[in-house]
Swiss-Prot record:
GO BP terms in the entry: prolyl-tRNA aminoacylation
Protein name, as recorded: Proline--tRNA ligase
Subunit structure: Homodimer.
Location in or out of the cell: Cytoplasm
Length: 572
């Protein structure tokens, strides 16, 4: 490729809404351009990166005998009604009518479609197992698209689906995908980990997320310092420390007046640390199809884990908290003064409050709190559940390490779906005895466009992107200095360019009449890993200058040796 025939589209400007480094560098390096909220045009440089990511994924899919297909992005709505996910997905689904008033959606995922058509293609257990995959654009109507391509409305995914006659066969394929994903992300030089995860709206009982570490990640992953435990934040558990306080029980209830509104200020006014306070939240419940209210109790320095709360049978999904107006109407007090004493509703407390003594609660009277409160003396024991987010230095569930928490970007997710979709969409095969049996199913996703951002988050410096060789838009760039003024430089530049092209090296030659500073700045910004600089000074000694993007080390290499040198570099 010659730069004179290429659309570089680099920029010095950073859009006001580009808050994280990957978004900024993707704009500045000419990879993407925004057309609307959560919608982006992929320019040639970005497309070259995506193509290489896809090639790595396709190669690994072929190794595990996954067959490539392509499904329509537009899906009939009735399939989603059959699976029960139409209402579950809610407003993230873009729904529309065609000219005949038929109902369709713009697909965010393809479990319904693939189950429907595979069920009509497979008639016997002898055709199983079968795995298919596609690389396709998806659409989810995100309420708040943000962080560039990390959270968009339109994105490219590799989604795969496997079909089996029994659970053990499903588990075998699931493990193959797990190992395949490890290989894929290693080839992209990502710092990542696989963690146990919740299946969410996808269904099934077992799933794993693949998370790339990033301080700008939306997700949080939890792992022990002994590396024996890992989980996403939703699923993370800890062993509760025993008996935080050594104070004696007191049955004394004391009203303490304060003008405090916020918890942390309240703590200072009462001289009571947050660790010795219990917060109360009121939420909607549904018992025997009757909507009611329940109270959640959590330690003052902890945070509710919405995912864990939603797992409780009586809790409405999604969670609905009573607002200030509703609390005042029901209890007659502002939310910050809510407490469990005297509430005639089910009370669910986090297990971390079990061993608390002489703690502080709201009194259900404005500007008043109760202190020195104890279970079984002043308050009846509530229902205890694990409803909080773990915190750093909590004891690991295995008891042999302490928990750490890091931010991350989800780049892949695999699920054992079991028979969820085949039962609802009624797809089955004949087994040996002639009876029909519902298919077992797994699904396996990789966020292709999101991977590009995750790699940039991990591989960049003040000058731009530092792509690994495997997914760089170009492997090598040739930078001839003052080529328009020196014909010998031009001849050598084109000679090396043709030599690299013939060898199969992905090379670009900067044949523009640009100042050296502009050329160097642009290739550093774009992140091309291997740079060959041809100048009058170097060719006088039959040399060219080699510079590696990641360490900026400059080496003089003889012209006749540079091809083999680059080949060896690319093999590393």
């Amino acid at each position: 490729m010659l730069t004179s025939q290429y659309l570089l589209s680099t920029s010095k400007d950073i859009p006001y809404d580009a808050k994280i480094i990957s978004h900024q560098l993707m704009i500045r390096s000419g990879m993407i351009r925004k057309t609307s909220s959560g919608l982006y045009v992929w320019l040639p440089t970005g497309m070259r990166v995506l193509k290489k990511i896809k090639n790595i994924i396709t190669t690994e899919m072929e190794k595990i005998n996954a067959l490539e297909i392509l499904m329509p992005i537009i899906q009939p709505e009735y399939l989603w009604k059959e699976s029960g996910r139409l209402n579950l997905y809610g407003e993230e689904l873009l729904r529309f009518l065609d000219r005949r008033k038929n109902q369709f959606i713009l697909g965010p995922t393809n479990e319904e479609v693939v189950t429907n058509f595979i069920g009509s293609e497979i008639h016997s257990y002898k055709q199983l197992p079968l795995t298919v995959y596609q690389i396709q654009t998806k659409f989810r109507d995100e309420i708040r698209p943000r962080f560039g391509i990390i959270r968009t409305r339109e994105f490219t995914m590799k989604d795969a689906y496997s079909f089996h006659i029994n659970q053990s066969c499903l588990e075998n394929t699931y493990n193959k995908f797990y190992d395949s994903y490890i290989n894929i992300f290693k080839k992209m030089n990502l710092n990542f980990c696989a963690v146990k995860a919740d299946s969410g709206s996808m269904g099934g009982n077992i799933s794993h997320e693949f998370q790339a570490f990033s301080q700008n990640g939306e997700d949080e992953i939890v792992f022990s310092n002994d590396k024996l435990y890992s989980s996403n934040m939703n699923m993370a558990e800890s062993i509760e420390t025993i008996d935080f306080f050594k104070k004696k029980y007191s049955s004394c209830l004391i009203k303490n007046k304060t003008n405090t509104k916020k918890s942390i200020i309240m703590s200072e006014k009462l001289n009571t640390p947050l660790i010795n306070q219990i917060q109360t939240f009121l939420i909607q419940t549904k018992i025997n199809d009757i909507t009611s209210i329940a109270a959640l109790l959590i330690r003052g320095d902890h945070e509710l884990n919405f995912f864990k709360v939603e797992k409780i049978d009586i809790i409405n999904k999604p969670l609905v908290f009573l607002n200030e107006k509703e609390v005042i109407s029901l209890i007659g007090v502002k939310k910050e003064f809510l407490g469990p004493l005297g509430l005639k509703v089910p009370i669910i407390a986090d297990i971390s409050t079990f061993n608390m003594k002489n703690f502080t609660i709201g009194s259900n009277i404005n500007k008043h709190f109760f202190i020195n409160v104890n279970w079984n003396i002043d308050l009846p024991m509530p229902i205890f559940k694990d409803i909080r987010k773990v915190t750093k230095n909590d004891l690991s569930p295995n008891g042999s390490g302490y928990l750490n928490i890091k931010q991350s970007i989800e780049i892949g997710h695999i699920f054992q779906l079991g028979q969820k979709y085949s039962r609802k969409i009624q797809q089955s095969v004949k087994i040996k005895n002639g009876n029909l049996k519902n298919l077992y199913m797994g699904c396996y996703g990789i966020g292709i466009t999101r991977i590009a951002a995750a790699v940039i988050e991990q591989h960049h410096d003040k000058n731009g992107i530092i792509w690994p060789d495997s997914i760089a838009p170009f492997e090598v760039v040739i930078l001839p200095i003052n080529m328009k003024k020196d014909n010998k430089i031009k001849i050598i530049a084109h000679f090396l360019y043709k030599k690299f092209k013939k060898t199969g090296i992905d090379v670009i030659l900067d044949d523009r009449d640009e100042r050296p500073g502009v050329m160097f700045n642009e290739v550093d910004l774009i992140g091309i890993p291997h740079q060959i600089i041809i100048s009058k000074r170097s060719i006088n000694y039959d040399n060219v200058e080699y510079r590696e993007r990641k360490n900026k080390e400059n080496i003089l290499i003889n012209i006749k040796d540079i091809k083999n040198f680059i080949i060896q570099k690319l093999k590393k």
